[in-house]
């Protein structure tokens, strides 16, 4: 009889562990960032289409690292930015309307603010954006209006 009771307790403990793990997974998933929590630094217009984006350091290559968001979705976490543009982030075919790019400084490097340069392109036209992001302030954003 004692063996049956210990098996029940083990099953209950295992069930509690599994439910805790599932709860932890769902409650700690990255939620979308809210545009209202970012400081708007400007806006641009671009024709809709297959949108891509490149991000690199427009100032001194001094160890900046950032988080990059598009429409609230984290697309690059702890991205170290350098003077050469990396491969393009393919954002897909986007419809006309308002979209936004968000930048949060993780490390400002050795000189001033984190200084990402963003090029957003529809395959034919592109627009270059310089954004400043500081560690101890509200993250920065740029509105992109697709026509």
Identify the meaning behind each predicted range.
Residues 2-70, 77-147:
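Terminal leader/tail segments of proteins
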């Amino acid at each position: 009889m004692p063996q049956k009771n210990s098996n029940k307790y083990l099953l209950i403990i295992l069930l509690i562990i599994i439910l805790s793990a599932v709860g932890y997974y769902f409650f700690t998933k990255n939620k979308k960032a809210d545009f209202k929590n970012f400081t708007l630094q400007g806006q641009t217009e671009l024709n809709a289409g297959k949108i891509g984006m490149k991000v690199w350091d427009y100032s001194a290559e001094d160890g900046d690292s950032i988080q990059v968001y598009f429409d609230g979705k984290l697309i690059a976490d702890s991205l170290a930015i350098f003077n050469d543009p990396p491969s393009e982030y393919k954002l897909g075919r986007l419809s006309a309307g308002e979209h936004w790019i968000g930048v949060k400084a993780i490390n400002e490097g050795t000189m001033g603010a984190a200084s990402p340069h963003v090029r957003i392109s529809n395959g034919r036209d592109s627009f270059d954006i310089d954004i400043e992001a500081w560690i101890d302030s509200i993250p920065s954003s740029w509105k992109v209006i697709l026509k």
